């Protein structure tokens, strides 16, 4: 497989952190994106597997005087809070543990806040969509078959711009919402590394959030009323 550096250097990771630093600089936003994604999905999908199980615990949840959509939205918001806390916990670990220096610098706090909030809500919406789309006993299988591949293709361990020399893959990963989580945090925390345009990141995070929230709420209502 060709080096993502285009063969200009012996190391495929050298030069990714264009403004200095090492692989730790590239990895920091990716690890935070993984923490947000896994925390958000697990906080929604795993409880739903139990609630939609044989005991149908979900029937007790929807007896509250709220619309079904409000119950689904509560799950997304609650998981988003957990995702923000997970990202806050991972940041110091990913910043101080690597042996190579990590060059993190926030140039726009509002952009960082927008990315974290949108990514956290998106992870919860993805968890709701997964939790309402598969049978409870298949949740564990989904983590192995779906979650892990989209993580490795989510620009976690490399910036999206590093895929320039593998053009078909660079275009193909654009359907992966985790790409925009990683790239958004990369643009906010390590702007010296290559990243997508900020406008594109915010637009695609919003698009996937709306799409997955709609799909998740529709699936949640269907499973509750079935």
PLM region spans:
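Short helix-capping/hinge motifs at transmembrane helix termini and TM-loop junctions
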Residues: 1-10, 38, 94-106, 132-135, ...
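Transmembrane helix segments
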Residues: 2-3, 131-175
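Hydrophobic alpha-helical transmembrane segments of multi-pass membrane transport proteins
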Residues: 23-97, 143, 151
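Short cytosolic juxtamembrane segments of multi-pass membrane proteins
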Residues: 219-226
